Amino acid sequence: MFSMVTGFMNYSQQTIRAARYIGQSFVITLSHTNRLPITIQYPYEKSITSERFRGRIHFEFDKCIACEVCVRVCPIDLPVVDWRFERDIKKKQLLNYSIDFGVCIFCGNCVEYCPTNCLSMTEEYELSTSDRHEDYTIQTVMNSTQIKIDKDKPFDSRTITNY
């Protein structure tokens, strides 16, 4: 008989403990009802980026001196800098500068080490497109206007990864 009373006491203690845990959980749930929502409705509301956000890289063609520091500090050797040496002025003349944003890891090394500050990180983070061929096109900047390289040329894996 004593074991039956002890079992009933253990059962009642466990029931009271379970009710207490359920009550505590309910109080926590009710405390969250007065809070404002944290999530944003993405397509309709844009998130505010921080001051040092590393978005799409902006390039100013006129400031570049074709020193290729950006290529040397890039962990994946991504920027492609085409230039020719002008003998009459004894300087490099930039012909073409391109970065493939499908491969870029947005580390910001090129922006940080650029001696002329011709590279900068923008707050643009929507780089995806609905056309799968646009994802791997190389963005080229000439005369401060952005144009895309011929999309009719097919890209293969060697073209995209070997620079």
Curated annotation (Swiss-Prot):
It is found in: Plastid, Chloroplast thylakoid membrane. Residues 55-84, 95-124 form the 4Fe-4S ferredoxin-type domain. It catalyses: a plastoquinone + NADH + (n+1) H(+)(in) = a plastoquinol + NAD(+) + n H(+)(out); a plastoquinone + NADPH + (n+1) H(+)(in) = a plastoquinol + NADP(+) + n H(+)(out). The keyword Membrane applies. Its EC number is 7.1.1.-. It is a peripheral membrane protein. Keywords: 4Fe-4S, Chloroplast, Iron, Iron-sulfur, Membrane, Metal-binding, NAD, NADP, Plastid, Plastoquinone, Quinone, Repeat, Thylakoid, Translocase. Binds 2 [4Fe-4S] clusters per subunit. One of its GO terms (molecular function) is NADH dehydrogenase (ubiquinone) activity. It comes from the Eukaryota. NDH shuttles electrons from NAD(P)H:plastoquinone, via FMN and iron-sulfur (Fe-S) centers, to quinones in the photosynthetic chain and possibly in a chloroplast respiratory chain. The immediate electron acceptor for the enzyme in this species is believed to be plastoquinone. Couples the redox reaction to proton translocation, and thus conserves the redox energy in a proton gradient. NDH is composed of at least 16 different subunits, 5 of which are encoded in the nucleus. NCBIfam families: NuoI (TIGR01971), PRK05888.1-3 (NF004537). Belongs to the complex I 23 kDa subunit family. This is NAD(P)H-quinone oxidoreductase subunit I, chloroplastic. It comes from Phoenix dactylifera (Date palm). The lineage of its organism: Eukaryota, Viridiplantae, Streptophyta, Embryophyta, Tracheophyta.
